[in-house]
Amino acid sequence: MPRTQNKDNFIDKTFTVMADLIVKMMPINDKAKRAYVYYRDGLSAQNAGDYAEALENYEESLKLEESPFDRSETLKNMAIIYMSNGDEDLALDTYQRALDQNSNQPSCLKNMGLIYEKRGRTAQEAGLQDEADQLFDRAADVWTQAVRLYPGGYLDIENWLKTTGRSNIDVYF
């Protein structure tokens, strides 16, 4: 049964009916409407923890969606799933694909930095300080971009940049 028909509570059912009506009335072509329905079903599945179904819906949405902005949102959600599943390489690649579609995605940069920083800590714990420093520098690079796009939005990252000595003074202006 399609995700849009598998609603258990009144609020979800009501929202789905309203969203379906809005989509039908939108002055966009049928292909874009179908892409949106797949995207919405992907979000619903992702929120329910059904990552396999979410990815299937996102893939279908990407086949239909032409808007770079909407494609970037879909790719970002896919990357979040890959990251949650521990597939960090695929997550990094997918975050980059999202940024290629829309470079104004600070959350993609933030999450990429989280992966690099985690890998840096792992390398450091293994005694691989040169590798750790390179990974920390990569984290700093993407986090600096994220902070520039969303000043004041990532205070923990700004603090990390300052305390590790990887902060550029112009990041905060």
From Swiss-Prot:
Its main location: membrane. It is a peripheral membrane protein. PROSITE patterns: TPR (PS50005), TPR_REGION (PS50293). Keywords: Membrane, Photosynthesis, Repeat, Thylakoid, TPR repeat. SMART domains: TPR. InterPro entries: PSI_Ycf3_assembly, TPR-like_helical_dom_sf, TPR_rpt. GO terms for cellular component: plasma membrane-derived thylakoid membrane. Belongs to the Ycf3 family. This is Photosystem I assembly protein Ycf3.
